[in-house]
Amino acid sequence: MGIANLIPVQSLEAVLAPIEQAHGLTNDFYTKQPFFELDRDQVLGRNWACIGFATDLPTNAYVKPMDFMGLPLLIMRNREGQVQVFHNVCSHRGVKLVQEAGTIQGMIRCPYHSWTYDLNGALRGTPHVGGINQHKDERFACEKHGLKPLRSAIWMDMVFINLSGDAPPLEEALAPLTERWVQFLGHDGMDLMRRETDGGKMSIEVNCNWKLAVENYCEAYHLPWVHPSLNTYSKLEDHYNIIFDQFAGQGSYAYNLSDVAGTHLPTFPSWPADRMRNAEYVSFFPNVLLGIQADHAFAMMLEPVAPGKTIEHLRLFFVGDEALSPHYEAARKAVMESWRVVFAEDIASVEGMQKGRSSPGYNGGAFSPEMDLPTHYFHKWAARQLLNSNEKA
C-alpha cells in the first residue's frame, strides 16, 4: 500500500522542514493500526529491525516463536549452533507451526497434517501426500516447500531481520557507529562484552507507540524533571547531542562509574583514562537503544506490540570474564537496579505522550531548535523512509 492512500505526502514533507518550522509526525502514525502496519512494512521492514537476542536460545536445536507486529516468526538455533529466522507457518496450509519456545528433539511437526521440517527449515516429511500410505509423490517436490527464511544477522547478541531483503548489509549500516566508538572501546571492546547467564536483563511493558520510546531516549532535555537522581551528577549541561546516519542520541561527560562497597567493575582496557566519566546513549534506527560506559554497555530492543503498546527488552554487557565473577555480583546488580529506576522514570512521560496523541488539540507538535535536534532527526529519518517507499510504490 502506498502511503498516499493513508496520509497526504505534504504532511510528511513538512516534517523535513528546518527544525524551527517543522512539525512532527502526525497522530495517526502513533494511534492507528494501518499506520502501525505501514511502520512494520516500510520503516522497520526496509531496514534492520531487532527481534530478539541470540543467547535467549540457550542450546542447539532450540526454537523461539515470536510475533513481529502481527507476523508470526521463528528464531531457530540449528543442531550446529547457527541462528536463523523463518516465517513460523507451515508451507502446506499456513498453520502456525511452533507455539512455545523450547528444544526440538526430532523434527518440527505441523499440528494440522503432520508435515515435518528439520532445523534448517527443509521439508522432510509429508504423510500421505500422494494418497494413503504414499508419503512421497513425484508431482510434489519437497525441496521447493521448506520454511520461508528471512534475511537475518547478529550483532552484540541482537538478532536482526530485514523483511524487504534489500537493505545494505547490517555491518555496513552499523559501521559509522562502530567507527565512532573505537575512541572509547578500541578495536577489541566489542569482543570483550560478556552477558550474565542469569540476570542482567529486564523487560518493561509501556503503553506507548514504539517511536515515542525512541524519541524520549534520543534527548536529554527532560533530564532535570524526569530523572532527578540522575540529574544530581549528570546534569543537563553535561550532555551533548549525537546525530549521524541511522543514529541519534546524547552523550554525557559526567557518568558516575559503578561503585558498590568500594568495588569498581572492570573497565574497557582501551577506554581513555581522561574520559572515564564519558558515556554515550544512541538509538540505532529503527528499534534499538544502545548505551556505552567505561565499565559496561547495554542494548535495548523495542518490541512494537500494538499502536499504543511496546515492550522494552534490556540486556547488560560487562567487560571480560572477570566481570562475571562472584566478586562483582553486587556491582552488577547495582548497575541493573540503577537502570531499572531510570527506565521506570520514563514510563509516565512516554505514556503521557501517547495519550496526547489522541487529542485533536495536538497533531505533531513543535521542536526546540536546540534541545530537540536528535528527536527531529529521528522524525525526519522516519518520514524519509515513508516518502521513499511511496516513490517506489
Residue ranges of each PLM-predicted region?
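Basic/polar N-terminal segments that are highly enriched at the extreme N-terminus
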Residues: 1-13, 387-393
